[in-house]
């Protein structure tokens, strides 16, 4: 008398379910130099560090950078060409790109990219060298909103 397993007909279904679950998993992002992780960036951009805003609604990981005003146009062009960030505009008392979202096609991680100047009266692009620093933040949400 031959015994047949009851689970044998279910085996393909179980394997398919496990494959689908594993395929949808992605490694949790960690705090790091996000621009460096995504590729090379201009030397004028200086990585300052990364921290997590645990008080924020989505507990984002935030990598910060700074770039001298004299080199800001190169940094802006790189962020526009590489990540689709908008052109910096002067509002009131600072230059701001407004937040832009970039999805890395390799990891599937969504990044928020923002570039802004310190407070300034220099309202013409030709005056950017007078601005000591522009700041770049690249953030990744760790929780759903």
Give, region by region, the residue ranges found by the protein language model:
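Bacterial N-terminal signal peptides that target proteins for export
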Residues: 2-14
């Amino acid at each position: 008398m031959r015994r047949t397993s009851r689970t044998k007909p279910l085996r393909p279904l179980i394997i398919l379910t496990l494959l689908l679950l594993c395929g949808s998993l992605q490694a949790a992002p960690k705090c790091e130099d996000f621009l460096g992780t995504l590729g090379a960036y201009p030397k004028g951009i200086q990585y300052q560090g990364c921290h997590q805003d645990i008080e924020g609604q989505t507990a984002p990981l935030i990598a910060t950078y700074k770039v001298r005003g004299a080199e800001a146009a190169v940094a802006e062009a790189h962020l526009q060409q590489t990540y689709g960030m908008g052109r910096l505009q002067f509002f009131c008392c600072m230059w701001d790109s407004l937040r832009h979202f970039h999805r890395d096609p390799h990891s599937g991680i969504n990044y928020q990219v923002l570039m802004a100047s310190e407070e300034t009266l220099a309202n013409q692009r030709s005056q950017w060298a007078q601005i000591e620093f522009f700041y770049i933040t690249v953030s990744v949400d760790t929780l759903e909103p």
